């Protein structure tokens, strides 16, 4: 979609007012176009989500997805559409869906990622390798929930903060920090990990 000149001028004025910096015509045109493209993607996603929500009214237990691949809201793996399930808790792979159905993991983990850790997050947030975490599990210091795969092996490991009260800290909060050259980087707060302090 070609932006009218009036819209580009308006964007330049808004940007200068908000950030105190003038944009060239080309910078303003590109930034405004990027904003419109983003809005189109968001609207398209919202329309798809509303259609899914309406379909749930006739299929309240959920349904398989079409038009994938999709990312599972629990394990975050990319899954082909025939191996996904959508219900009131969101899009899940069939392994995670079965784990929710069998109450191996609570349904709230689908939408509230701040209430649990996956194995990779220990390394990401605390620089603790999975071997150390599994040692804590064997020693009974950490409780782990397992999402099994179809053959009974391990598909995903979850560590609920609720199951490990007083042992697992809340998830570190993030913030954008300015760096050189008008750029920003994402930083996480430092949160102590109690099992390493004993």
Regions found by a protein language model. Give the residues of each.
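Short helix-start
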Residues: 94-102, 143-177
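C-terminal, charged low-complexity interaction regions
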Residues: 168-198
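Polyanion-binding surface elements
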Residues: 110-136
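Short linker/helix segments within small regulatory modules
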Residues: 82-91
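Short cysteine-rich clusters marking metal-coordination/redox-active sites
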Residues: 72-75, 93-96
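Flanking scaffold residues of small Cys/His-coordinated metal-binding clusters
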Residues: 66-67, 87-88, 114
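Cys/His-rich microdomains that often coordinate metals
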Residues: 77-81, 100
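Short metal-binding segments enriched for Cys and/or His
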Residues: 47-48, 97-114
């Amino acid at each position: 979609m070609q932006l009218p000149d009036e819209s580009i001028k308006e964007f330049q004025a808004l940007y200068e007012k908000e950030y105190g910096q003038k944009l060239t015509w080309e910078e303003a045109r590109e930034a405004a176009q990027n904003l419109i493209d983003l809005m189109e993607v968001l609207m398209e996603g919202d329309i798809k989500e509303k259609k899914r929500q309406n379909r749930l009214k006739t299929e309240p237990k959920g349904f398989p997805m079409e038009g994938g691949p999709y990312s599972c809201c629990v394990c975050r793996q990319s899954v082909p559409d025939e191996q996904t399930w959508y219900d009131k808790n969101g899009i899940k792979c069939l392994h995670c869906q079965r784990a929710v159905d069998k109450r191996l993991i609570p349904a709230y983990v689908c939408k509230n990622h701040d209430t649990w850790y996956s194995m990779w997050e220990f390394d990401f947030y605390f620089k603790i390798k999975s071997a150390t975490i599994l040692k804590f599990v064997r020693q009974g210091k950490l409780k782990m929930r397992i999402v099994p795969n179809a053959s009974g092996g391990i598909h995903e490991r979850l560590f609920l903060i609720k199951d490990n009260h007083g042992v697992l800290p809340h998830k570190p909060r993030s913030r954008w920090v300015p760096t050189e050259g008008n750029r920003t980087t994402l930083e996480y707060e430092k949160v102590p990990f109690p099992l390493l302090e004993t």
